[in-house]
Curated annotation (Swiss-Prot):
This is Thiosulfate/3-mercaptopyruvate sulfurtransferase 1, mitochondrial. Its EC number is 2.8.1.1, 2.8.1.2. Keywords: Acetylation, Mitochondrion, Pyruvate, Repeat, Transferase, Transit peptide. The gene is STR1. Its main location: mitochondrion. The lineage of its organism: Eukaryota, Viridiplantae, Streptophyta, Embryophyta, Tracheophyta. GO terms for molecular function: 3-mercaptopyruvate sulfurtransferase activity; sulfurtransferase activity; thiosulfate-cyanide sulfurtransferase activity. It holds the Pfam family Rhodanese.
Length: 379
């Protein structure tokens, strides 16, 4: 079914290269039609709009900018690579590029349609909702090892590959996919600093539509995961995983930490949502925060160009909330997406073992017996 769905949507448009000289408008459909590869897709006729940003120096990622620069020179101690680096290494055979765009329910943006309109050359589409746990009602929860391996194998990702993930906002959902690969033992993964907006603002080409191969791989990944959860055999599974349990927390672990704090708990949501003065974007979710947690909104990790801050500036952000880098830290958010941005910031500071509460606030707030704090409750 998924393959047919992709064919209707993607094959309707020709595969072409959009050069920087063409007008570029930001895609913003009037209605959000789908967050899943299995949903019905409408047309994607809106183009992108360019913004003007100054290029960021490659020095920020600790690698040089020159054509043919080997991917082996990138350190896994850095969570990001620059658009200049990616452009120089775009044709490396062992480099996989993933468009992992995903948006909040109230944003009314369709990442699949936006991928059709414009994506970085060679990029595959990584469906955050499709490559997820199919046995829970919580959104995009971490899949099983076997399911993740099946999805990556269907996408054509090998263990020898370096993986660069980007999204349509700058740094947003790509951080979650960066974390997912690390949870399953693949360390050779980075986020594109500034994402697709930065890529386009730097004058680099994007492709419109998608090749038949990319369509089939994206469709096959979701279908493979569905089969795994139905108990069916999927072959071949070529991507090997090694689960890292210390990077993901469950509800019980958060409860235990609340009662006996051993980890500093940071929340990536906005201050208004944390305080309970703004409603949650998902209906039926209580407002407030987990007792004992501290609020560090994820945009504090970025500079004005929506790229990751230098280490010294990142440290200031955590110092302001009395978060010590010498003590254990865990992170949460709304559904386990933007918490990964805080983990990226801490990764740049050398703290590479920050777990994410996968269910995050959406899981916690839907449990009526669990305590919450808010401005009202504390006043």
């Amino acid at each position: 079914m998924a393959s047919t769905l992709f064919s209707r949507t993607f094959l309707a448009a020709s595969h072409r290269l959009i050069t920087p000289s063409l007008p570029q408008k930001i895609f913003n459909p009037a209605t959000f039609l789908s967050r899943s590869l299995h949903s019905q897709l409408g047309s994607a006729s809106t183009a992108y709009k360019s913004t003007t940003w100054a290029r960021r120096a490659m020095a920020s990622t600790g690698v040089e900018t020159k054509a043919g620069y080997s991917t082996s020179s990138v350190s896994t101690s850095e969570p990001v690579v620059s658009v200049d680096w990616l452009h120089a290494n775009l044709r490396e055979p062992d480099l996989k590029i993933l468009d992992a765009s995903w948006y909040m329910p109230d944003e009314q943006r369709n990442p699949i349609q936006e991928y059709q309109v414009a994506h970085i050359p060679r990029a595959l589409f990584f469906d955050l909702d499709g490559i997820s746990d199919r046995k829970t009602s919580l959104p995009h929860m971490l899949p099983t090892e076997e399911a993740f391996a099946a999805g990556c194998s269907a996408l054509g990702i090998d263990n020898k590959d370096e993986v660069v993930v980007y999204d349509g906002k700058g740094i947003f959902s790509a951080a979650r996919v960066w974390w997912m690969f690390r949870v399953f033992g693949h360390e050779k993964v980075w986020v594109l600093d500034g994402g697709l907006p930065r890529w386009r603002a730097s004058g680099y080409d994007v492709e419109s539509s998608a090749s038949g191969d990319a369509i089939l791989k994206a469709s096959a990944a979701s279908e493979a995961i569905e089969k795994i959860y139905q108990g069916q055999t999927v072959s071949p599974i070529t991507f090997q995983t090694k689960f890292q349990p210390h990077l993901v927390w469950t509800l019980d672990q958060v409860k235990n930490n609340m009662e006996d704090p051993t980890y500093q708990h940071i929340d990536a949501r906005s201050k208004a949502r944390f305080d309970g003065t703004a409603p949650e974007p998902r209906k039926g979710i209580r407002s407030g925060h987990i007792p004992g947690s501290k609020c560090i909104p994820f945009p504090q990790m970025f500079d004005s160009c929506n790229t990751l801050l230098p280490a010294e500036e990142l440290k200031k952000r955590f110092d302001q909330e009395d978060i010590s880098l010498d003590k254990p830290i865990m992170a949460s958010c709304g559904t386990g997406v933007t918490a990964c941005i805080l983990a990226m910031g801490l990764h740049r500071l050398g703290k590479t073992d920050v777990p994410i509460y996968d269910g995050s606030w959406t899981e916690w707030a839907t449990q009526p017996d669990l305590p919450i704090e808010s401005v009202e409750s504390s006043s």
